[in-house]
Every structure is written in C-alpha cells, then in structure tokens.
C-alpha cells in the first residue's frame, strides 16, 4: 500500500482495519512521489549527494519516471514498476535503465580521466554499487513473462527507457559538475576493490 502511495504522488490511500477491539485507520499520502520513495528506502544511509536525481520522459505512449541516488552502502536497491505493478525480476525497463546508467556513468568516469589514473576497467556493477533506484513506467499494453507479472517483456520499452535515462542523466551531469566527480570516484573505488578481491 505504501508503494502505491509513493507511485501515485499526492493521492491519499486510506486503510480501515475493523478486525480488532479498537478499529484502526491508516492514511498514506506522499507528495514527493518516487523521489520521496528513494529517500524513504535510503533512510539510515548517507547519500553521496542530495536530493536524488529524478527524471521524467515519454515516447510513443510510454512514460518513464525514475529517481535514484547513491549512498555509502555497497548494495544495490532497485525497484521496478509497470503501471504501478512491481516486477521483482525486472525486465526490459530494467535492461534499458542499466544500459543507459552504465554507459553514462562509466563514460563520464573515463572521460574525466579518473578511471585512467587509477588504471581500472569499469563494469555496470561498479556503477550500481550503493545505488537506490525506483523506476516506474506506464505502458499502454504491457507484456509480461507470466501471469504473476514479475518480469516485463515488452521489447519496445527498453530503447525508450534507455533514451530517457541517457538524456536526463547526461543533462544532470552537465548541470551539476561536482556530483559526477564524487560519483566517479566511488565507481572507480568499487572497480579497484573488485579487482583487488579478484587478485587475492
């Protein structure tokens, strides 16, 4: 229920529980949308920068909304939704997001010279270390791998998500010159740690 409240910004969801002696009512409303969702997921962590990066875009009837931030954590937290339905196994929207994120973040780290100075090869896992992301797409006629809708398989979604993320993240990098340097240092550090662990 909380996920739905975050995904539908400013919509109040009311849950009435009359089972006990004292009836309970819970009202959920979040004005910040998925950006507030990322902050909620990252409570207790130290973000690399604030507020989270957020992007909205659409193409061919498919709308994409994403919010993401990196923290001092070493784990990736990725939540994907299609028409407010969660996909625990990701799918084409996740594939498009990861491709764009890896290309943009690692491209910046390479072009800034940080990766070359440290002499490390960057991977997608390095770019996603410490990442918390909520990705929500609205698709007119989505196709899923099963009735449980755990994985989106609509092939037209991948290039749309890839394009939106590439454009918006690239634009964010240009408008915020300090944050990409901090992020690149974290990515290179993750790559160096991965290489050291492999050699050990």
Question: Which sequence ranges carry the predicted segments?
Answer:
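GHKL-family ATPase ATP-binding module
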Residues: 2-200
């Amino acid at each position: 229920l909380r996920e739905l409240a975050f995904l539908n910004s400013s919509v109040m969801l009311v849950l009435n529980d009359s089972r006990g002696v004292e009836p309970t009512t819970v009202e959920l409303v979040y004005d910040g949308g998925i950006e507030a969702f990322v902050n909620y997921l990252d409570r207790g962590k130290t973000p690399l920068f604030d507020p989270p990066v957020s992007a909205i875009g659409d193409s061919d009837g498919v709308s994409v909304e994403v919010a993401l931030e990196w923290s001092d954590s070493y784990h990736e937290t990725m939540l994907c939704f299609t028409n407010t339905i969660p996909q625990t196994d990701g799918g084409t929207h996740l594939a498009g997001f990861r491709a764009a994120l890896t290309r943009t973040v690692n491209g910046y780290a390479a072009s800034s010279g940080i990766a070359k100075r440290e002499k490390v090869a960057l991977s997608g896992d390095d770019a996603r270390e410490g990442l918390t992301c909520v990705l929500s797409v609205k698709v007119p006629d989505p196709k899923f791998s099963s009735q449980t809708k755990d994985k989106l398989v609509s092939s037209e979604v991948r290039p749309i998500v890839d394009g939106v993320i590439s454009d918006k993240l690239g634009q964010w990098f240009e408008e915020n010159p300090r944050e990409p340097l901090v992020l690149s240092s974290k990515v290179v550090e993750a790559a160096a740690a991965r290489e050291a662990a492999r050699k050990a």
